[in-house]
C-alpha cells in the first residue's frame, strides 16, 4: 500500500515521502495516528496545499525538543534515593518511570517513553548517564546519581 507521510517516521521516511508499506502497518498504525494518508491523486493535492503548514509544525516541534534538550543537559546530576544493601545492590530497580519522575521533579517535563535504558533497569547505586530521546532527531544525556536511602 502506498502512503504519503505527514510526519517524520524513524526507519521509514520524512514528511512528504511517498513510501510503500504493508497494508496492516498502514491501516493499524500510520492512518489512525494521522502520520500518513493513502497516496492517491486527491490526497496528493491536499497534501501539497498543506505542505508548508506541516513543515512549520515539524520545525516547531524540533525547536521545542531542542530547547528541552538544552534544559536537560544543563541539569546537575539528578539524584534518586532507593533502598540498597551493603554492597550497593538495590532492593528493586530504577526503571524508565523512576528516571522520568526524578527529572520532572528536578524541573524539566519528561515522559517515561522518552527515556532510553538500553541495558535494562538500573540495579546498583552509582552515577549513570541515561540517554533521553525527545524527538527523532534530538537526544540528550541526563546525569543520574543513584544513592542508598537511609
UniProtKB/Swiss-Prot annotation:
Keywords attached to this entry: Ribonucleoprotein, Ribosomal protein, RNA-binding, rRNA-binding
GO BP: translation
Q: Which sequence ranges are marked TM in the entry?
A: none
**What is known about what this protein does?**
Binds to the 23S rRNA.
> InterPro entries from the xrefs?
Ribosomal_bL9, Ribosomal_bL9/RNase_H1_N, Ribosomal_bL9_bac/chp, Ribosomal_bL9_C, Ribosomal_bL9_C_sf, Ribosomal_bL9_N, Ribosomal_bL9_N_sf
GO annotation, cellular component aspect: ribonucleoprotein complex; ribosome
Q: Which Pfam families match?
A: Ribosomal_L9_C (PF03948), Ribosomal_L9_N (PF01281)
Q: Which organism is it from?
A: Shewanella piezotolerans (strain WP3 / JCM 13877)
- MF annotations from Gene Ontology: rRNA binding; structural constituent of ribosome
Question: Would you tell me the protein name for this molecule?
Answer: Large ribosomal subunit protein bL9
- Spell out the PANTHER family in the cross-references: 50S RIBOSOMAL PROTEIN L9
Q: What family does the database annotate?
A: Belongs to the bacterial ribosomal protein bL9 family.
